[in-house]
């Protein structure tokens, strides 16, 4: 008799950092029936392919202060556990994969109650609260950074790097009018944008443009001054669908330092200037970026350390030093595993797949 496909529930929600690694894994599991668990009105509504049934439950993260809202959130978390448990039973889910975030806690606990395997992928160098608290409840916590294991004593961990989507592994072309020989800077503030970073870049950009440098600036959707700079070599867009093509073409990136973005930079061997989001939980973007800076694959600066003049001069120094950029690119190539998604898929198969006859 034919093998019955294993049904997998992927719980990933909210930001590109949570969604893109999960999507990369899903691409490597054509033999699985995949269903998706998210939160209403979040990014997964537009990013998750229609081929994966999308279930949503309303949920929030805990507040730091004890109060009425915290109690309401606690009850919503408890309700979410039973909602996920019911979904697992109804849909006959055989295994669970999650990338952390609000949705992960109830999902991990529901999987334990259902006695099915659960794998958590922690992409950040400093593990999140859910990983620290519930990592021991998972069959395995797969890590994006090797050094993260030291923060998770007593947890079963394995390093697989962070998965990237297949297009990052295949040469891509751009539909932008940028000459092949032009020096290209790509500026990215992450899936949520970065107004302060955008302002800094726009103040610095005129000196770069005078040198004939091209700039693709991804501003996000919440920048009121996104259209304030106009130049034939400057392309400003909220987002760009073909990030693989952009990073492959870029001579230099100026970026926040979410784990997925850093992995993409490593896979595409893109030198970078990293400016961590200053309000990230537990300052995790700084510690992610520090790995790249210590490997001499990137320059790392706190946002409050930078001025437009300093950033402008730093970029022009790199522009005039192709040997330095080549060395940074070489170092970046050592910081990620190109077949991470395959390693993670193999891990999940070992933990979950059962023969049906």
From Swiss-Prot:
Designated name of the protein: UDP-N-acetylglucosamine--N-acetylmuramyl-(pentapeptide) pyrophosphoryl-undecaprenol N-acetylglucosamine transferase
GO molecular function: UDP-N-acetyl-D-glucosamine:N-acetylmuramoyl-L-alanyl-D-glutamyl-meso-2,6-diaminopimelyl-D-alanyl-D-alanine-diphosphoundecaprenol 4-beta-N-acetylglucosaminlytransferase activity; undecaprenyldiphospho-muramoylpentapeptide beta-N-acetylglucosaminyltransferase activity
Record Pfam families: Glyco_tran_28_C (PF04101), Glyco_transf_28 (PF03033)
Classification via SUPFAM superfamilies: UDP-Glycosyltransferase/glycogen phosphorylase
PANTHER family reported in the protein's UniProt record: GLYCOSYLTRANSFERASE, UDP-N-ACETYLGLUCOSAMINE--N-ACETYLMURAMYL-(PENTAPEPTIDE) PYROPHOSPHORYL-UNDECAPRENOL N-ACETYLGLUCOSAMINE TRANSFERASE 1
Function: Cell wall formation. Catalyzes the transfer of a GlcNAc subunit on undecaprenyl-pyrophosphoryl-MurNAc-pentapeptide (lipid intermediate I) to form undecaprenyl-pyrophosphoryl-MurNAc-(pentapeptide)GlcNAc (lipid intermediate II).
Record keywords, A-Z: Cell cycle, Cell division, Cell inner membrane, Cell membrane, Cell shape, Cell wall biogenesis/degradation, Glycosyltransferase, Membrane, Peptidoglycan synthesis, Transferase
Biological process, per Gene Ontology: carbohydrate metabolic process; cell division; cell wall organization; lipid glycosylation; peptidoglycan biosynthetic process; regulation of cell shape
């Amino acid at each position: 008799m034919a093998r019955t496909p294993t049904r997998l529930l992927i719980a990933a929600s909210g930001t590109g950092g949570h969604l893109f690694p999960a999507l990369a894994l899903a691409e490597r599991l054509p033999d699985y029936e995949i269903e998706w668990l998210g939160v209403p009105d979040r990014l997964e509504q537009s990013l998750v392919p229609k081929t994966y049934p999308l279930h949503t439950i309303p949920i929030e993260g805990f507040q730091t202060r004890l109060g009425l809202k915290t109690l309401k959130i606690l009850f919503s978390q408890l309700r979410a556990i039973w909602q996920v448990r019911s979904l697992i039973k109804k849909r006959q889910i055989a295994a669970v994969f999650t990338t952390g975030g609000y949705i992960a806690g109830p999902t991990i606990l529901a999987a334990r109650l259902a006695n099915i395997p659960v794998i958590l992928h922690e992409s950040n160098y400093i593990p999140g609260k859910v990983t620290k608290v519930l990592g021991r409840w998972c069959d395995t916590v797969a890590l994006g950074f090797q050094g993260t294991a030291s923060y998770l004593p007593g947890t079963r961990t394995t390093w697989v790097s962070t998965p990237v989507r297949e297009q990052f592994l295949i040469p891509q072309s751009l539909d932008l009018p940028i000459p092949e020989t032009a020096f290209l800077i790509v500026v990215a503030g992450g899936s949520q944008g970065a107004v302060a970073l955008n302002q800094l870049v726009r103040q610095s950009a005129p000196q770069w443009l005078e040198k004939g440098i091209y700039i693709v600036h991804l501003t996000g959707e919440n920048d009121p001054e996104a259209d304030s700079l106009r130049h034939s070599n400057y392309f400003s867009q909220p987002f760009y669908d073909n990030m693989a093509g952009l990073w492959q073409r870029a001579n230099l990136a100026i970026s926040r330092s979410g784990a997925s973005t850093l992995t993409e930079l490593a896979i595409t061997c893109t030198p970078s200037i990293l400016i961590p989001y200053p309000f990230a939980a537990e300052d995790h973007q700084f510690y992610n970026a520090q790995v790249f800076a210590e490997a001499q694959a990137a320059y790392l600066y706190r946002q409050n350390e930078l001025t437009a003049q300093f950033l402008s001069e730093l970029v022009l120094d790199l522009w005039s030093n192709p040997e330095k950029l080549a060395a940074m690119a070489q170092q970046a190539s050592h910081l990620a595993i190109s077949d991470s998604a395959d390693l993670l898929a193999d891990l999940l198969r070992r933990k979950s797949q059962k023969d049906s006859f």
